[in-house]
Swiss-Prot record:
It is found in: Cytoplasm. Mn(2+) 2 binds at residues 298, 303, 351. It catalyses: 2-deoxy-alpha-D-ribose 1-phosphate = 2-deoxy-D-ribose 5-phosphate; alpha-D-ribose 1-phosphate = D-ribose 5-phosphate. This is Phosphopentomutase. Belongs to the phosphopentomutase family. It is an enzyme of class 5 (isomerase).
Amino acid sequence: MSQFDRIHLVVLDSVGIGAAPDANDFVNAGVPDGASDTLGHISKTVGLAVPNMAKIGLGNIPRPQALKTVPAEENPSGYATKLQEVSLGKDTMTGHWEIMGLNITEPFDTFWNGFPEDIITKIEDFSGRKVIREANKPYSGTAVIDDFGPRQMETGELIIYTSADPVLQIAAHEDIIPLEELYRICEYARSITMERPALLGRIIARPYVGEPGNFTRTANRHDYAVSPFEDTVLNKLDQAGIDTYAVGKINDIFNGSGINHDMGHNKSNSHGIDTLIKTMGLSEFEKGFSFTNLVDFDALYGHRRDPHGYRDCLHEFDERLPEIISAMRDKDLLLITADHGNDPTYAGTDHTREYIPLLAYSPSFTGNGLIPVGHFADISATVADNFGVDTAMIGESFLQDLV
């Protein structure tokens, strides 16, 4: 019999809690990540008030220096620790795949200076359309169509851009480049980015409509992803007939592998929390696992190096945490974590190699305290242990510590 009927894992995308031991092996604009500290620097520079996460034990997590404005609790309501990444990468897919039990020894490729000319020319030759070179770099998806949509409407050129993650995105006005054509181009782009030196996690079709100054992305987005190279704990649960619910971009990250209920993309963190609470309230969700990603911390504030916005986003999540807790059933377990860091005070605009926090809460807890410092995959090992399925490649369960 499972210790918990349901486990809800919430990833606060990029909310790291201090440089990992190997952080200096990773760089931002030529600066090693060794001094990065997402939560620590936000707390120190702009202040951070997250009383609900603090109550569970966020301020109790061991650090060289305590979080300046997040006090430790004498009697926390749950358990806390920090986890280290093993895999050779600091991107979203690597972090999530490791959380679900895989060790990624060959990281995906990211393109901070845009895609190489040979990829661009291959897409041009295949599609018969030119590519707007000025857009070929990491770009906000809304800003890139604001900046280059008018030109695309005049010339029919493709808008190809990337982000901090290993993705190639193609934006196309639906009245200029029909959806079927866009999808066909994306399928081709997928076929030429399956191995080094351009091993990408996803190709994303980003259709939009409207007029200059009033463009809107449509629901016709399509992701061309790769599935994990081995079974994750999601697959183990699915194979055992256990419900797995994905909220936000989780389904995309795993290419649907091991997920039997996709609850859709999030329009915002708040929308994602609404969807999570709705999922938790489903009468048919009696036993199983929900997996939620809240991406605004990373996409809107981390990459843009906006500590004030990042802080406010954390405050907004913390204010809604009691709603999530209220939706829990007596034998539910809530796990709150991250997938990498993205220190908004740091050099560059890339993710940062950090420990991730882990907070655990259940209405059934009779104890509290610290869990030993472990690794990302310990989360999936704990989920597997609880539901009686095999673990994936790596991970050690801490289920026995949750009493």
